[in-house]
């Protein structure tokens, strides 16, 4: 789907979130990596419109950019946020847990089957 540079960037973000969570936990700061599904950005929608047969159905499953904000808002309000810190989360799955919907009222489907499982890191800390 994407090239190695894209994948390396995503993997680096996941590891950075994990490592930052260790450093910031004593200060009460939570850090997570959030995996979004296909985003219905203006650019993405133009691509879909230019080749509707090629991308049939994909727009129906795309998440709005506002959906990301709604999930982040729910996370910020979660009194148990620190228990999620240092982990990778799929936005659609968090949304289902929090009862968050997209701007059109839909509950986006988790892209886990397409993207694979989220990254997990060990608890070892070297000081």
Regions found by a protein language model. Give the residues of each.
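Residue-level detector of anion-binding/catalytic polar loops
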Residues: 30
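Catalytic loop of short-chain dehydrogenase/reductase
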Residues: 1-26, 36-39, 45, 49-51
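Flexible loop/turn segments at secondary-structure boundaries
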Residues: 40-41, 97
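C-terminal helical subdomain
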Residues: 33, 55-127
């Amino acid at each position: 789907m994407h090239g190695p540079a894209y994948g390396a960037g995503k993997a680096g973000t996941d590891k950075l979130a994990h490592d930052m969570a260790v450093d910031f936990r004593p200060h009460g700061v939570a850090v997570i990596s959030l995996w979004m599904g296909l985003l219905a950005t203006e650019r993405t929608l133009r691509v879909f419109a230019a080749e509707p047969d090629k991308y049939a159905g994909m727009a129906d499953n795309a998440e709005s950019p506002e959906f990301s904000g709604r999930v982040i808002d729910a996370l910020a309000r979660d009194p148990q946020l620190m228990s999620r810190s240092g982990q990778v989360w799929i936005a659609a799955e968090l949304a289902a847990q929090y009862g968050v919907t997209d701007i059109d009222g839909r509950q986006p489907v988790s892209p886990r089957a397409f993207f694979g499982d989220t990254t997990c890191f060990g608890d070892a800390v070297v000081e």
